[in-house]
């Protein structure tokens, strides 16, 4: 027994429902663990398979805009026995949005530091020696706040507030996508083509973090950023928005700085870290200490414990 069963992404909810039913019957599944996908099938799984356990990991905040949506989510979530929230911020939004406080708990994700494959990546990317490297990772311009980042870098360059030269590496925007075109346009309009590099989707994130000096997470919404956790592992100071679970791993003035989302000028406080190597290194050491609380091994052990508790 064991292995991975893949489902095509481009199928309807009904086809997805049939697929899940088939897997449950064929593999004699005891626990169904939702991460993403159509929660609408959960009530029907409960009816068809009353003995299986249904749990969920909530990776992002819930924003309930109206009563109808709230009722819909309550209906979908009612069959779940457990909600594993990736941060206190996500748990808070979950309870305030749809309730289920007695079923909700925080279980932080974990990361593992990988080996460096290309220690000469700076040379490969043609980044001059002495340039301060800032990195941000995300899949969507608006959600991850890359437009805010571009504006803040533009503000810094226009005001000549930086004592050191910088380069910003943007990772995760698929090349030839609408977002990629929009990002290139934003960068060009701000005349920052020589300061911001969009590297697309990469498999060498660890190599990139290894050559970075500062990590940025200007998200408009965030559950708990695995990218920040990885950055902490590489002793990087972090500047992030005060949303979701970010304040739980970025401690103001200790291993980085927090700013209100949409606030271009607050994010422009990047200059504090760019201009002060000693502050960067001091905060980076604190990041490494904080990262020890979020190991992959601990996350797996706690998840296994939840599986046994629900069985």
Label every model-predicted segment.
Residues 201, 220:
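Aromatic "clamp/platform" in nucleotide-sugar-dependent glycosyltransferases that forms part
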Residues 80-106, 111:
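A short, active-site helix/loop in glycosyltransferases that binds the activated sugar's phosphate group
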Residues 115-127, 183-184:
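A short helix/loop element that forms part of the nucleotide-sugar donor recognition site in Leloir-type
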Residues 252-253, 257-264, 272-278:
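Conserved acidic donor-binding segment of nucleotide-sugar-dependent glycosyltransferases
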Residues 55-86, 98-99:
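A conserved, positively charged/aromatic
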Residues 137, 167-181:
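Glycosyltransferase donor-sugar binding loop
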Residues 237-240, 250:
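Short hydrophobic beta-strand element within catalytic cores of glycosyltransferases
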Residues 128-144, 150-153:
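Conserved donor-binding/catalytic core segment of Leloir-type glycosyltransferases
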């Amino acid at each position: 027994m064991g292995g991975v069963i893949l489902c095509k992404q481009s199928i309807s909810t009904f086809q997805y429902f049939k697929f899940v039913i088939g897997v449950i019957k064929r593999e004699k599944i005891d626990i169904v663990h939702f991460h993403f996908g159509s929660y609408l099938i959960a009530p029907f799984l409960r009816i068809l398979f009353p003995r299986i356990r249904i749990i969920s990991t909530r990776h992002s905040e819930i924003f309930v805009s109206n009563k109808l949506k709230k009722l819909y989510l309550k209906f979908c979530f009612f069959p779940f026995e457990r909600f594993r929230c990736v941060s206190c911020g996500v748990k808070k939004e979950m309870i305030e949005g749809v309730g289920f406080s007695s079923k909700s708990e925080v279980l932080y994700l974990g990361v593992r530091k990988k080996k460096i494959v290309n220690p000469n990546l700076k040379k490969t990317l043609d980044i001059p020696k002495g340039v301060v490297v800032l990195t941000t990772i995300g899949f969507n311009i608006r959600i991850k706040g890359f437009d805010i980042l571009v504006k803040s870098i533009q503000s810094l360059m226009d005001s000549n507030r930086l004592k050191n030269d910088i380069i910003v590496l943007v990772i995760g925007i698929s090349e030839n996508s609408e977002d990629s075109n929009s990002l290139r346009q934003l960068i060009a309009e701000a005349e920052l083509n020589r300061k911001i590099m969009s590297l697309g989707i990469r498999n060498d994130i660890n190599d990139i973090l290894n050559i970075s000096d500062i990590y940025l997470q200007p998200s408009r919404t965030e559950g708990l950023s695995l990218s920040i956790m990885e950055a902490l592992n590489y002793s990087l100071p972090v500047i992030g928005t005060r949303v979701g679970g970010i304040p739980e791993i970025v401690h103001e003035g200790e291993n980085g700085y927090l700013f209100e989302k949409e606030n271009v000028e607050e994010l422009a406080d990047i200059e504090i870290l760019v201009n002060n190597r000693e502050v960067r290194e001091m905060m980076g050491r604190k990041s490494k200490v904080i990262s020890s609380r979020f190991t992959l091994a601990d996350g797996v052990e706690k998840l296994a414990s939840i599986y046994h508790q629900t069985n």
